[in-house]
From Swiss-Prot:
It catalyses: L-histidinol phosphate + 2-oxoglutarate = 3-(imidazol-4-yl)-2-oxopropyl phosphate + L-glutamate. The modification N6-(pyridoxal phosphate)lysine is found at K226. It holds the Pfam family Aminotran_1_2. This is Histidinol-phosphate aminotransferase. GO terms for molecular function: histidinol-phosphate transaminase activity; pyridoxal phosphate binding. Its EC number is 2.6.1.9. It comes from Campylobacter jejuni subsp. doylei (strain ATCC BAA-1458 / RM4099 / 269.97). Pathway: Amino-acid biosynthesis; L-histidine biosynthesis; L-histidine from 5-phospho-alpha-D-ribose 1-diphosphate: step 7/9.
Amino acid sequence: MKFNEFLNHLSNYEPGKDIELIAKEYGVKEVIKLASNENPFGTPSKAIECLRQNANKAHLYPDDSMVELKSALAQKYKIQNENIIIGAGSDQVIEFAIHSKLNSKNAFLQAGVTFAMYEIYAKQCGAKCYKTQSITHNLDEFKKLYETHKDEIKLIFLCLPNNPLGECLDASEVIEFIKGVHKDCLVVIDAAYNEFASFKDSKKHLEPCELIKEFENVLYLGTFSKLYGLGGLRIGYGIANANIISAFYKLRAPFNVSNLALKAAVVAMDDDEFTKKTLENNFSQMQLYKEFAKKYDIKIIDSYTNFITYFFDEKNSTDLSEKLLKKGIIIRNLKSYGLNAIRITIGTSYENERFFTEFDKILR
């Protein structure tokens, strides 16, 4: 059977390995997953109780207006319901953005190394990709590439903070950059990890209500997968002016998010105790990873996320990843990004100590 030609130029996204599969493959009793930037404390207890109470409604289609969650988000961000679209993860909203703006005759712009799904989705449309020479977000390079190819570029991705590297630009820098972008070019700010950045440094905080008030061409993305511990329910959102949201709705299938996910997201948003514990743990445990890197002279980029990336010169990241797997520790090897590096999710104190103990043995 023949398939569309563009599929020959696509590669699969590589997700973090599954705990049960690793336990079976390597014969390890206890497996710790520090690969997919999931919340180390799991799902909030209030959200779990909500899921229990609504499990008997799993046979029902959700409220397609999603008014309850939209209203909660609108109140949080001081915006209107018409400024919000809910997706099966923020990934789906990325897909809406790409399919609404890109085709084989135009292009998009991104950092040298960033979230892989931007390019995967864009290649489905045949769009050309311009990347900065720097692997991190260098706005001077973004400006130069945009000015050179502005007639082609119809979409710009800013992953703030950046996955898989962790760096983050100051909000003021981002706003100044957007001022130089034509209003017909959509600027996507992927803020999946922005709560972690804002907790660490208020200068990194981006306020979506201010962004969409000042710019008609900005899309702000948020997710419930990281801070709120709902990764398995696949739910995220986009915030933009009403015209953008209206266009996206033409691409959205009905009932794209389950009723259980919608209910749990509303409850999780209101669990301040859980999010506070998550942010405080992440900040304190991140310091230990920095100290470990310093001990072994491992290169890092200052991370504003819930993960840290270790770069290596002589040691091979694939070998290191395999040795950790044999010890029952799953991390993310970044060879697929062209980097000799590993990305480690900040876990609980117990999980992190396990990592330090085993990685210490490997590096000696």
